[in-house]
């Protein structure tokens, strides 16, 4: 779910950047999304959005699904998840969290005018 996803982001980036910095970034980080991603981090958000869409097509509720995960030295991972929906959503979130951690953060792409830049 979205609360767990925020913890996974913090785990993957080892607390270097607060989760709120990802909530209004580029064209896809935050609610909704359209146009062409502005950079690598925004592409991570689009991939995560697409993964959640795929989960919904499978009958899952990704924004509300609670799953079991662990934050280790090397970052987050999903733990012993037997239910397919929960596993799918956890995998979406873990992959996105690692993608966020690897991608450069460009302050100029935070809180952009999406009407102009995300066509």
From Swiss-Prot:
Q: Name one GO biological process term.
A: lipid catabolic process
**What Pfam families does the record tag this protein with?**
Phospholip_A2_1 (PF00068)
Which tissues is this chain's protein expressed in?
Expressed by the venom gland.
Tell me which GO cellular component terms the UniProt record holds. Answer: extracellular region
Xref: InterPro entries:
PLipase_A2 (IPR001211), PLipase_A2_Asp_AS (IPR033112), PLipase_A2_dom (IPR016090), PLipase_A2_dom_sf (IPR036444), PLipase_A2_His_AS (IPR033113)
The EC number of this protein is: 3.1.1.4
Q: Does the keyword Metal-binding apply?
A: yes
Q: Which UniProt keywords apply?
A: Calcium, Disulfide bond, Hydrolase, Lipid degradation, Lipid metabolism, Metal-binding, Neurotoxin, Presynaptic neurotoxin, Secreted, Toxin
Q: What class of enzyme is it?
A: hydrolase
Any GO MF annotation of the entry: calcium ion binding
Location within or outside the cell: Secreted
Q: List the disulfide bonds.
A: 11-71, 27-118, 29-45, 44-99, 51-92, 60-85, 78-90
Q: Which reaction does it catalyse?
A: a 1,2-diacyl-sn-glycero-3-phosphocholine + H2O = a 1-acyl-sn-glycero-3-phosphocholine + a fatty acid + H(+)
Cofactor: how bound: Binds 1 Ca(2+) ion.
**SMART domains given in the database record:** PA2c (SM00085)
Q: Where is the active site?
A: 48, 93
Which cofactors does the annotated protein need, by name?
Answer: Ca(2+)
- Residues binding Ca(2+): 28, 30, 32, 49
Say which family it is in: Belongs to the phospholipase A2 family. Group I subfamily. D49 sub-subfamily.
**Function according to Swiss-Prot or TrEMBL:** Snake venom phospholipase A2 (PLA2) that inhibits neuromuscular transmission by blocking acetylcholine release from the nerve termini. Notechis II-5 is less toxic than notexin but has a higher specific phospholipase activity. PLA2 catalyzes the calcium-dependent hydrolysis of the 2-acyl groups in 3-sn-phosphoglycerides.
Please state what the protein is called.
Basic phospholipase A2 notechis II-5
Species of provenance: Notechis scutatus scutatus
């Amino acid at each position: 779910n979205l609360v767990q996803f925020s913890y996974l982001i913090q785990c993957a980036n080892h607390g270097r950047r607060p989760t709120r910095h990802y909530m209004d970034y580029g064209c896809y980080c935050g609610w909704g999304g359209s146009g062409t991603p502005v950079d690598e981090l925004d592409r991570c958000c689009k991939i995560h959005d697409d993964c959640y869409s795929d989960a919904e097509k499978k009958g899952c509720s990704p924004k509300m699904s609670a799953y079991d995960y662990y934050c280790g030295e090397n970052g987050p991972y999903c733990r012993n998840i037997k239910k397919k929906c929960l596993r799918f959503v956890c995998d979406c979130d873990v992959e996105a969290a690692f993608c966020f951690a690897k991608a450069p953060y460009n302050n100029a792409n935070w809180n952009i005018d999406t009407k102009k830049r995300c066509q």
